[in-house]
UniProtKB/Swiss-Prot annotation:
The lineage of its organism: Bacteria, Pseudomonadati, Acidobacteriota, Terriglobia, Bryobacterales. The active site is at D13 (proton acceptor), H41 (proton donor). Gene3D superfamilies: Adenylosuccinate Synthetase, subunit A, domain 1 (3.40.440.10), Adenylosuccinate Synthetase, subunit A, domain 2 (1.10.300.10), Adenylosuccinate Synthetase, subunit A, domain 3 (3.90.170.10). Pathway: Purine metabolism; AMP biosynthesis via de novo pathway; AMP from IMP: step 1/2. Plays an important role in the de novo pathway of purine nucleotide biosynthesis. Catalyzes the first committed step in the biosynthesis of AMP from IMP. IMP binds at D13, E14, G15, K16, N38, A39, G40, H41, T129, R143, Q224, T239, R303. It comes from the Bacteria. InterPro entries: Adenylosuccin_syn_GTP-bd, Adenylosuccin_syn_Lys_AS, Adenylosuccinate_synth_dom1, Adenylosuccinate_synth_dom2, Adenylosuccinate_synth_dom3, Adenylosuccinate_synthetase, P-loop_NTPase. This is Adenylosuccinate synthetase. The keyword Transcription regulation does not apply. NCBIfam families: PRK01117.1, purA. GTP binds at residues 12-18, 40-42, 305, 331-333, 413-415. It comes from Solibacter usitatus (strain Ellin6076). HAMAP family: Adenylosucc_synth (MF_00011). Substrate binds at A299, V300, T301, G302, R303, P304, R305.
Length: 434
């Protein structure tokens, strides 16, 4: 057992929130390292449903520390709303949540820029959540962003805010996308936000590294999925942050040498929200069956997810980028009623058959999936928590995925509750989780 990264191996929505929540009790700290409030982790505890967008799922475990790393962009209003909701539900937040002083701050102007630019003529529609995440990261990369540490220094913040917002207004007006903002009222509101979060702000890189040196363990919680990574995803239909394993280091300030392992989370099928290529998307009614059985609607937006079949070339690609030690397969029970389960094993582009992910969207949109069909099991797997109790055909399906991807399946989720989970004895997953 050591310091472990848990992240999505597909296009997000793989069920990471449940897995992080379930195993957080075995770690001392859970740290988020990228993204913003555009990605929601849904966790069920008995009759209670929690949708966490910024705060790590580990906050739901008594006595565990939760860290929001420097790689995130933070809308203070969204963060404080989440804190208030947790506290109202009896979850202790103060003293358990730590916010990086180097994380960037998201403003209403960022939302304005995103909403308007997404609809501009000639612009490729990415299908964003319109929460301003991309424009905030743009400011970060352009070195004009405002960080949490800046927000806490009132005099410095006021000067920086005036300069940045003046530029934003000029750009928005030039592009014809300006909508009226009361910049003074927003500034005052953010100064009030600063006082509420001040007790939780620190240098989280120091906190994490000191904890690791003292023998404590950290779980790094990824948001979204590798295929939405700014560098390695289906660009430009991606998010604006590093959603792969490398982002855990840059987004927290913890060195790669201090990471013990990487666990990938994947559905037993695959889904995607928003635009972009999706080679195995099912259009023949099977996609609708998966969506209804799996309740595939976005945790943040409520949008119906596009659904399709497991994509082996995609998984091999994300396993290679992240160095997965083990896979978690979620929502196995969603496939319980299928007689045959197609699995994409390669792609055909024209008269060529390829087994690797094409690098461009243009090529991705031309691929035809090559399927092999695996027999279904037509027996309920819902709630099973012991591998030996799975139907033989369900075990064969998991073995097939292992053989095709080259990565062990060390954990299987068969329902939304904590106890509806299988950990395979002797697996690399078990050794990393402890």
């Amino acid at each position: 057992m050591g310091n472990v990264i848990i992240l999505g191996s597909q296009w997000g929505d793989e069920g990471k929130g449940k897995i992080v929540d379930l195993f957080a009790e075995r770690f001392d700290i859970v740290a988020r390292y990228q993204g913003g409030h555009n990605a929601g982790h849904t966790v069920f505890i008995g009759e209670k449903k929690f949708v966490l967008k910024l705060i790590p799922s580990g906050i739901l475990r008594p006595g565990k520390k939760a860290v929001i790393g420097n790689g995130l962009v933070i809308d203070p209003a969204a963060l404080l709303s989440e804190i208030d909701t947790l506290q109202a539900a009896g979850v202790p937040v103060m003293g358990n949540l730590f916010i990086s002083n180097r994380a960037h701050v998201l403003f209403p102007a960022h939302r304005m820029m995103e909403k308007m630019s997404e609809g501009r003529e000639g612009r490729v529609s990415i299908g964003t959540t319109s929460r301003g995440i991309g424009p905030c990261y743009e400011d970060k990369i352009a070195r004009r962003g405002i960080r949490i540490a800046d927000l806490l220094d009132t005099e410095f913040f006021r000067a920086q805010y005036a300069s940045v917002m003046e530029e934003k207004v000029l750009i928005a007006k030039a592009l014809g996308i300006y909508s009226e903002l009361d910049l003074r009222a927003i500034r005052d509101e953010y100064e009030a936000f600063a006082e509420r979060i001040r007790p939780m702000v620190c240098d989280t890189s120091v906190l994490l590294n000191d904890a690791i040196r003292s023998g404590k363990t950290v779980m790094f919680e990824g948001a979204q999925g590798t295929m939405l990574d700014i560098d390695h995803g289906t660009y430009p239909f991606v998010t604006s942050s590093s959603a792969s394993a490398g982002g855990a280091c840059t987004g927290t300030g913890v060195a790669p040498t201090r990471i013990s392992g990487v666990l990938g989370v994947s559905k037993a099928y695959i889904t995607r929200v928003g635009g972009g290529p999706f080679p195995t998307e099912a259009f023949d009614g099977a996609g609708d069956r998966i969506r209804e059985r799996g309740k595939e609607f976005g945790a943040v937006t409520g949008r119906p997810r596009r659904c399709g079949w497991f994509d082996v070339p995609l998984l091999r690609y994300t396993a290679n980028i992240n160095g997965f030690d083990s896979l978690v397969i979620t929502k196995l029970d969603v496939l319980d009623e299928f007689d045959q389960i197609p699995v994409c094993v390669s792609y055909r582009i024209g008269n060529r058959e390829v087994v690797d992910m094409p690098p461009t969207v243009a090529e991705m949109e031309k691929v035809e999936p090559v399927y092999e069909c695996v027999p279904g099991w037509n027996t309920s797997t819902f709630g099973i928590s012991q591998f030996g109790e799975l139907p033989a055909k369900a075990k064969e399906y998991l073995a097939y995925l292992e053989n095709r991807t080259g990565v062990e399946v060390g954990c299987v989720s068969t329902g939304p509750e904590r106890n509806q989970t299988i950990v395979r004895a002797g697996s690399r997953f078990e050794s990393l989780i402890g």
